[in-house]
Amino acid sequence: YARAIKETFGTDFNVLFGPAYKGIPLTVAATMSISEMYDADIRYCSNRKEVKDHGDKGILLGSPIKDGDKVVIIEDVTTAGTSIEETLPIIKAQGDVDVLGLVVSVDRMERGKGTKSALKEISEKYGFKTTAIVTMADVVEHLYNKPYKGKVIIDDTLKAAIDAYYEQYGAEE
């Protein structure tokens, strides 16, 4: 994540935001890595699915988001953009902030609501950058007809099924 974030956004931001639940450990780990690898002072913030009224109260974990912050969102995958639609109002409710974009680990390369990929639709709808560390095409290429511990993970039969799936549901770009 740290390298993908740096390559896409530099270090000209100050908050990484990870939507609950998977985004919480991703955000903490990425923030630590960016700090260590690039000597950048980046804070992290995540939301909870439900507000707590004890301990660390509220809907947010980590550093508060405040006016003037520049935020990058990180997630594991994005399929239809639903999580972003839920996340942006939470971030924007914290103050006058600039959401710079979204980094995901895997671009599933599936259509969003139209024929474009969900990541492309998100980028166009919200006017910010989106990037993925790897695509499903990268994963398939890496595993196709290559043995792992004596077994081929993606053989010709599975590759044909994957190709058929993407023919029907894959983004057209």
Language model regions located:
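Active-site-facing substrate-recognition patch
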Residues: 1-10
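Short, well-ordered alpha-helices that flank and scaffold nucleotide-derived cofactor binding pockets
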Residues: 3, 32-36, 89, 93
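Nucleotide/phosphate-binding catalytic cleft detector across ATP-hydrolyzing
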Residues: 9, 32, 173
